[in-house]
Amino acid sequence: MSTLTRSPAWLALSAHQTEIANRPLRTLFDEDPQRFDKFSLQFKDLLLDYSKQPVDATTIRLLLALAEQQKLVDWLGRMANGEKINFTESRAALHIALRANSPVFMDGVDVTQEVRRVLRQIEQFVQKIHNQSHRGYSGLPITDVVNIGIGGSDLGPVMVTEALKPYHLPQLRTHFVSNLDGAHLSDTLQHINPATTLFVIASKTFTTQETLANAHSARKWFLAGGGSKQDIAAHFVAVSTNREAVSQFGIDPDNMFEFWDWVGGRYSLWSAIGLPIALAVGMEHFHSLLAGAQAMDDHFLTAPFEQNLPVILGLIGIWQINFFHITSQAILPYDQSMHRFPAYLQQLEMESNGKRVTRNGEAVDYSTGIIIWGEPGTNGQHAFYQLLHQGTQKFTADFLAPCRCHHPLSEHHPMLLANFFAQTEALMRGKTEQEVRSELANQNLSADLVEHLLPHRVFPGNHATTSILFKKLDPATLGMLIALYEHKVFVQSVIWEINPFDQWGVELGKQLAGKILAELALDKPVTGHDASTNGLINFYRAQQ
């Protein structure tokens, strides 16, 4: 057993789980009519309801004791004070500085000065695009923005841009290209004009294979479509830390928007990586997005843990993953504009906490991270909810929804939210054999048919969910939501004693792909891999 799993706080939670696991959720609600009031929290217009989780007052007390044992307070301070807590890369993790309204220091230097400088650069550029003083090579204004990036240079910006569609400025269309599959770029290029298109090449190192392949193809298309090399300056900008590589590509370094090595990719949408967001919705709304995140930062760093939304959300996840052995979490936004939110959280959670060794390099003997997936409601109800209600796989789920909608079809929203509320209740309560029998008896069915149908109509229930409601999905609220999950991930990493800010797991496949790419051009059978990989490569080559 590791130090963590034999610690007093961990052992106390293990013993408590044995007891509370025998108390179904519907029983917990039946026993305590005030359960919602006791196990829900509100911050500004954001409501977090965790009363449908298998917790009682003892659970929360023991989880908070675990947080104290793991020195969560100290780690919050270390992050906020710019310590190099990403120790495998010798970097700080200061994404909170990107939205801070007061100085944040690293190595004695207030990094927010540089943040503000780049924000001013972004604002000036966005203004030129919007007022059409920045024009394409033919003199026409820019009508389309194509962001080329992958991972953190794509998932955050595309998620936010989609979520804030009601705030889009009408004169610009925003597109995102990430996949190395040429179809992604090719399909996008079919709908735009080289003379009125701006490409944003987003890569921290400016060496990412997928991004550079797409960027070079986009440049080739641009030059073939009437633009010259001199015109690239008006149509290509870069978001990067590598000025030399940007210049070698042909982009004017003055058109490079900088960010810093203390900004992790999956935490970078608040930085210059968010340029396409600012272009889509304008700087006022981009600043509101930052302000919402900053408000959640302040709450996270100052609120008592028992009233702290990210802390409670993170600890509930620990409770489910490590003591109920849940490996799957559905993210279910009942808002179509949030359709990319599950994919965004996949990277945030799985790339951050998908680690197998502690900060000290010791193999863990407990689960870390969870498989994140999801789909907007009510689409998911007609796809995978069957398994959630009557299947055999264990899971937990977060339901998210706005109380008010942006679109004019307002009569749809009560129906949507009725489904939201119904699903969380149905997953929790289920339907007992007695309830099904009574229901069938009222349908004038024969006794034999009732017995035949009975087992198929029973819902076991007792499925844990967390609900997050908010007034309306505006930029500030979205900023709060994203920061809520960012900090939740950090809380869990502290409990698990892992580094959530590196991602060495993405490297091995990239290294092998480089070797295999050269082999695909050989004129002889490939034999240097295992039999399966050799067979796959040789089959591919035979089809060319």
From Swiss-Prot:
Main subcellular localisation: cytoplasm
GO molecular function, one term: carbohydrate derivative binding
Matches recorded under SUPFAM superfamilies: SIS domain (SSF53697)
NCBIfam families per record: PRK00179.1
TM helices/strands, residue ranges: none
PANTHER family: GLUCOSE-6-PHOSPHATE ISOMERASE
Similarity field: Belongs to the GPI family.
GO biological process, one term: glucose 6-phosphate metabolic process
Reaction(s) the record says it catalyses: alpha-D-glucose 6-phosphate = beta-D-fructose 6-phosphate
InterPro entries assigned to the protein according to its UniProt record, in alphabetical order: G6P_Isomerase, G6P_Isomerase_C, Phosphoglucose_isomerase_CS, SIS_dom_sf, SIS_PGI_1, SIS_PGI_2
EC number, UniProt record: 5.3.1.9
Main function: Catalyzes the reversible isomerization of glucose-6-phosphate to fructose-6-phosphate.
Annotated active site: 351, 382, 510
Localization per record: Cytoplasm
Recorded GO CC terms: cytosol
First-level EC class: isomerase
Pfam families tied to this protein: PGI
Top-rank taxon, per record: Bacteria
Protein's pathway: Carbohydrate biosynthesis; gluconeogenesis; Carbohydrate degradation; glycolysis; D-glyceraldehyde 3-phosphate and glycerone phosphate from D-glucose: step 2/4
Organism: Nitrosomonas europaea (strain ATCC 19718 / CIP 103999 / KCTC 2705 / NBRC 14298)
The protein's name in its UniProt record: Glucose-6-phosphate isomerase
Keyword check for Isomerase: yes
UniProt keyword Transmembrane present: no
Alphabetic keyword roster: Cytoplasm, Gluconeogenesis, Glycolysis, Isomerase
